[in-house]
Amino acid sequence: MIIYQLKDGYRYNSDTIMLYNFIFDISPKGDILEVGAGCGVLGLLLKRDLKNANLTLMDIQKENIKLCEINSNENRLDVNTILADFKEFKSDKRYDAIISNPPYYHDGVIKSENLHPNISRYSSNLSLSDLIQNSSTHLKSHGSLIFCYDAKQLMNVAYLLLKNKFCMTKLKFIYPKIGKKAKIALIEAKKSSKSLCLVDEGFYLSDENGYTKEALKLFKKANLESKDIVLGKNYD
């Protein structure tokens, strides 16, 4: 799959690939909304591999929606796009699943001078509370919110999910290297559910020799080829 990205903008990383595989294993069906789609790589991978899924890609940035359209056309994948701020989004439609790789860096971290990656990375642009609360509004009963987040903030994640009547039903930790602490938590939470939480085996990205066999296998499964693109000022 060919994915065009802004040369000087936010670029997807291994977190996206890990989340893609996590969602693929869950295999949600029906109407799926991706919040903060960026260049569209997560949603397009799922549209390619989940035959019973209808994907809608949402982003607050106009240039990202254009990238989603370019990438969906390039790969001949039929998805919908919505240019909107999820915090302000209003719709009567209810989704079977909402997926997101949300921003989780806090404001104390030194920011880039480039606005595009800042909006994608920092939680001030879409707080965890906003994501969870608004997902509850736009999900069907027992619909799934599937996302990744900073593993160090898992207690806050669990609190906000319970506060908004979600039940965490699946959890998987991603470790940057064997012997290191978990960096990312992959989470599925179901609205109005009382299910127990299944904790998956952890995933290790690298060892002393480089990427693990499991990571290389996953990268091959994703089969991504990234290309840089520069959008002109007029890209309606």
Spans of features found by a protein language model:
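Short amphipathic alpha-helical segments
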Residues: 69-70, 110-112, 158-161
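Mobile active-site "lid"/loop adjacent to the S-adenosyl-L-methionine
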Residues: 103-130
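Residue-level signal for inorganic ion chemistry
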Residues: 19, 101, 131, 189
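Conserved SAM/SAH cofactor-binding pocket of Class I
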Residues: 21-91, 97-100, 106-108
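SAM/dcSAM-binding transferase cores
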Residues: 182-236
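Conserved Class I SAM-dependent methyltransferase catalytic core
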Residues: 2-5, 12, 125-176, 180-182
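S-adenosyl-L-methionine
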Residues: 1-26
